[in-house]
Amino acid sequence: MIEIKHLRTLQALKNNGSLSAAAIQLHQTQSAISHQFNELEKKLGFKLFIRKSNPIKFTAQGEILLQLSKEILPKIHKAIQNCKKTHQMIIKLAIECHSCIQWLTPALKIFQKKWPRVEIDFYSDMIFSPQPSLQQGKLDIVLTSEVLPRSNLFYFPIFDFEVRLVLSPNHPLAQKKHNILPEDLISEILMIYPVKRDKLDIWKFFLQPAGIIPIFKNVNNTLLLIQMVAAKMGITALPHWVVDTFEKQGLVVTKKLGDGIWKRLYAAIRDGDQKELIIKNFIYAIRLHVCTHLKFIRDTQKPHFFKNVKNI
């Protein structure tokens, strides 16, 4: 019975004090405003204001509806603004790959140029466990090399990378002709990120199976890690692409671990979210960037996943 336009007209009448002034504000004729009130009062069965009063004086019923307009109209305005923001999506992202930030930052900038309404909230895996948080809906995407079985998560492959031993050019192991063996590291200081040991590829796939336990030293920054290696303060294991620039400068050298440790980086999402347009485009953007710009990786393109993805 009472429409939004009636509440707006009541408020305009209150603010302007006359039908003629209210009509100007609402871009209507005075007769149209008067007709609107007559029809509404007829439906309601009571008067809303006293005619020919100057300034306009509202009846008790009119005051009640006027108060309603003050409460309702701001809420309607806010709701409309929220509706307009539906295109402004937030992607909650976490990484379990410390060194990935090196290529992720420029990839995010490229994505946001194409999708300026999409906000990226970045979370650190140092604070919580990303994949359980993804399962609980607290995150949207996790970049990880660990696949959890029976997790109801979908793992989209981004690229394959080799984990290599990184050491100073003056380190004795740098001169060895053969690939590095587990026993070569038995007395070495192995500098690692401050994570659980079973998350370290060199431990899980190389040292632990051979029963070799070197001296571990925590370092929480990739650049510092490489600088310490260059200064012969220890050795480390990193994806080959991470140290490419430093190796070219002669600051460090890399060696293959055994027959080679190859890992795959995934974008983990909740199963079903692979159909979401924004999620698909985000993964497409970072994969396209990294496979175009990073060296020493293998492309793992999965074309059917990108069907109907916006051309970015």
UniProtKB/Swiss-Prot annotation:
A Pfam cross-reference name: LysR_substrate
Which sequence positions fall in the DNA-binding region? 19-38
Q: Does the keyword Amino-acid biosynthesis apply?
A: yes
Q: Which PROSITE patterns match?
A: HTH_LYSR (PS50931)
**GO BP annotations, alphabetical order:** methionine biosynthetic process
SUPFAM superfamilies assigned to the protein according to its UniProt record, in alphabetical order: Periplasmic binding protein-like II (SSF53850), Winged helix' DNA-binding domain (SSF46785)
Gene Ontology MF annotations: DNA-binding transcription factor activity; transcription cis-regulatory region binding
Report the subcellular localization: Cytoplasm
Q: Does the keyword Ribonucleoprotein apply?
A: no
Q: Which family does it belong to?
A: Belongs to the LysR transcriptional regulatory family.
The entry's protein name is HTH-type transcriptional regulator MetR
Source lineage: Bacteria, Pseudomonadati, Pseudomonadota, Gammaproteobacteria, Enterobacterales
